[in-house]
Amino acid sequence: MYRHDGAVWCVSWAHPKFGTILASSSYDGRIFIWREQNGQWQRIYEFTLHTASVNLIAWSPPEPGCHLAAASSDGSVSVITFLDNAFSHQIFPAHGLGVNSVSWSPSLAPGQLTSAQAPGSPPAPLRRFATGGSDNQVKLWDYNPQTQSYDNMCVLSGHVDWVRDVAWSPTPLNKSYIASASQDKTVRIWTCPASADMGNASNWTSTELKFDAVIWRVSWSLSGNVLAVSGGDNRVSLWKESLKGGWDCVKTIEE
């Protein structure tokens, strides 16, 4: 087994339709991609273009393909694509002070799952993700097939300290939800209606949840209606949207 030269911060599984593929990222600035073959794990790709710690990696939903996004302290985001047993990559600046997290959107736009589709070819699956940075901002990125690059479609501002984590809710129903966790001891839940242009920051509203400690991670349930929050107080709290649109803590798990 090959080894990283520093602490391993994150591991992430690709969708099983692409095989048994695992990615790892490290303080050493490298990303390894592994595949199980004949009962043995083999490193099939190494990405070395980041110049600082790779803090978080995330595979895209399977519909747009096999894409791995990585957030690095060097201020850049990379997207590695696995297609026809070959790898390609893109790397671009995202947050000048460092990128701490990345999270893919659902492959369907909000409302597509429940609305009637016109006859003909279905809409192309989305290749879109959110990043959180040490510049206190959340940024949204969308793949542009014309330029074959990722465009910054929106900047969400409101935190007053580093954004440690972002999580895009997997539900594509009637709204888009993004949760952001910050060193400012708050979580913001950003909401955009299905009918609105999510590339316009004014269409996003945020609900602020306040805590007594730094917040490290946020994670949505698979159904996208429960948010788990963990922070420096060694607690995990579960939050759910009420019928009135507020967010209530429904359970707290303590160490």
Per-segment meaning from a language model:
Residues 1-8, 47-54, 92-99, 105-106, ...:
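WD40/WD-repeat beta-propeller blade N-cap
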Residues 7-9, 18-21, 43, 53, ...:
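WD40/WD-repeat beta-propeller blade-loop signature
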Residues 24-28, 70-74, 131-136, 180-185, ...:
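Conserved strand-to-loop turn within each blade of WD40 beta-propeller repeats
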Residues 12-19, 58-65, 84-85, 103-126, ...:
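Loop/turn segments within WD40 beta-propeller blades
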Residues 11, 31-36, 57, 77-82, ...:
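WD40-repeat beta-propellers
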Residues 35-39, 82-84, 142-148, 191-200, ...:
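Short loop/turn segments immediately following beta-strands, especially the blade-tip
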Residues 161-194:
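Loop/turn-rich, solvent-exposed surfaces of beta-rich toroidal or solenoidal domains
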Residues 203-255:
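C-terminal interaction modules of eukaryotic adaptor/scaffold proteins
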